[in-house]
Amino acid sequence: MVRVRLAPSPTGTLHIGTARTAVFNWLYAKHEQGAFVLRIEDTDKERSKPEYTQNILEGLQWLGINWDEEPVIQSERVAQHREAIQTLLDRGLAYRCYASETELTAMRDAQKAANQAPRYDNRHRTLTPEQEQAFQTEGREAVIRFRIDDAAEIRWNDLVRGAMSWRGSDLGGDMVIARRAPADQIGDPLYNLVVVVDDASMEITHVIRGEDHIANTAKQLLLYEALGLPLPTFAHAPLILNAEGRKLSKRDGVTSINDFRAMGYTPDAIANYMTLLGWSVPEGMEEQFSLCEAAAVFGFDRVNKAGARFDWDKLNWLNAQVLHGWTADHLLEELTPLWAERGWTPPSEKSWCLDLCALLGPSLTLLKDGVDQAEPFFDRPDLQEDALKQLGIEGAKAAMADLLQRLENNPWDGSDVDQAKAWLGDAAKAADVKKGVVMKSLRAALLGRLQGPDLITTWSLLARIGEDLPRLRRCLG
């Protein structure tokens, strides 16, 4: 059975790169009727925090990505990691390196001065017992390094990139697999070693991650071989790029799923767009789809090698499509807590709230637009400059005065739309202006601006809560 994993480090909130990796893993698992599992890689003791773990788990659930087993906590498996390192030491495939940080810095500086690529020169690979004892007598601690044969040919078939080949000489010398510690101990195990041990223990069949891990894959394949562990299949998805074609980073601003949520993006749109970042839809399939619809056709034959540029216009279009497809009930459910954050208390009449949502829904791009556009229905707005200019047009206030008089003589409850339209025409005739002037002026009076949703429905909603007459009186001064 196919088993894939997401292995986030809880050193920050859920990043869109991790979210996209999660989506690809989940889609492949579901397509193959396999298992999607989580491993929390919390071995960075200084930066890992429980609140980040919680944020990652909540973010995945928000996106609609659920896991099939209890998450594995990497820090609880340190004994197994050290056991694997001891096995490598016992087999002569790893050794203790006593080179100090000062010596390693001097080595790298010399390489840089000679225009050489930085790499460890394997200086302590063949220490004699006497040399080791001398370093220990000095009080030196040691890292543990895994031997890498410069002549080694490392090959694998990548599901995205096809045949891949690396030489051992490309990997920077013997690899550190445990941090510095006294010579009679094994220090904290490091990433490449623990990932191999954990993936094998979890029986992961497919490792799906970003292309920035390709060099790690070459190193890890050597460790799989040295430890005699079964090899998974690898797939390296393209990086997510900014508009300039550089790897998306915090410098580009919004990179956290938290940020997207706060901006008013929906989980359906984000999950949809994460799928499109590097995957091409099959011919005949629309670009708006659910994760389950994508899972039915997902495969790595349609995952691109080239980097995926983040396109805000496409994301906004997708989000708008999602919002436009919501019922008024669903939109009201999502907007009610956002309105409450602004201190707004909607009328007790639910039908009014549903009608407001039905009015606003077709114009929304972000969920927070449903807050911005709802504001004049809850708070009486100031008259903006364009509204004041409109009301200053010859005949505009006369038309508003005529309309106000009609409403005071015959209050409108917002239900008879034909009557409202007739009043607009009558006011235009009375003030000797075009009907368009009356409509623009009424919008200015009611909303304080010239842009907004359907005028008659807007007027009806305000009339139903007794807000049309006060706003008309205000505009007349």
Swiss-Prot record:
Keyword Ligase in record: yes
Motif ('HIGH' region): 8-18
GO molecular function: ATP binding; glutamate-tRNA ligase activity; tRNA binding; zinc ion binding
Gene3D superfamilies named among the record's database cross-references: 1.10.10.350, Glutamate-tRNA synthetase, class I, anticodon-binding domain 1, Glutamyl-trna Synthetase, Domain 2, Glutamyl-tRNA Synthetase, Domain 3, HUPs
Protein location: Cytoplasm
Entry-linked InterPro entries: aa-tRNA-synth_I_cd-bd (IPR045462), aa-tRNA-synth_I_codon-bd_sub2 (IPR020751), aa-tRNA-synth_I_CS (IPR001412), aa_tRNA-synth_I_cd-bd_sf (IPR008925), Glu-tRNA-ligase_bac/mito (IPR004527), Glu-tRNA-synth_I_codon-bd_sub1 (IPR020752), Glu/Gln-tRNA-synth (IPR000924), Glu/Gln-tRNA-synth_Ib_cat-dom (IPR020058)
SUPFAM superfamilies: An anticodon-binding domain of class I aminoacyl-tRNA synthetases, Nucleotidylyl transferase
Binding site for ATP: K250
Chief location of this protein within or outside the cell: cytoplasm
Motif, 'KMSKS' region: chain positions: 247-251
EC number: 6.1.1.17
Domain of life of the organism encoding this protein: Bacteria
Entry keyword set: Aminoacyl-tRNA synthetase, ATP-binding, Cytoplasm, Ligase, Nucleotide-binding, Protein biosynthesis
Keyword Cell cycle assigned: no
Catalytic activities: tRNA(Glu) + L-glutamate + ATP = L-glutamyl-tRNA(Glu) + AMP + diphosphate
Gene Ontology CC, one term: cytosol
Gene Ontology BP term (one): glutamyl-tRNA aminoacylation
Protein family membership: Belongs to the class-I aminoacyl-tRNA synthetase family. Glutamate--tRNA ligase type 1 subfamily.
PANTHER family: GLUTAMATE--TRNA LIGASE, GLUTAMATE--TRNA LIGASE, MITOCHONDRIAL-RELATED
Assembly with partners or alone: Monomer.
Function: Catalyzes the attachment of glutamate to tRNA(Glu) in a two-step reaction: glutamate is first activated by ATP to form Glu-AMP and then transferred to the acceptor end of tRNA(Glu).
Protein name: Glutamate--tRNA ligase
Source organism per UniProt: Synechococcus sp. (strain CC9605)
Primary gene name: gltX
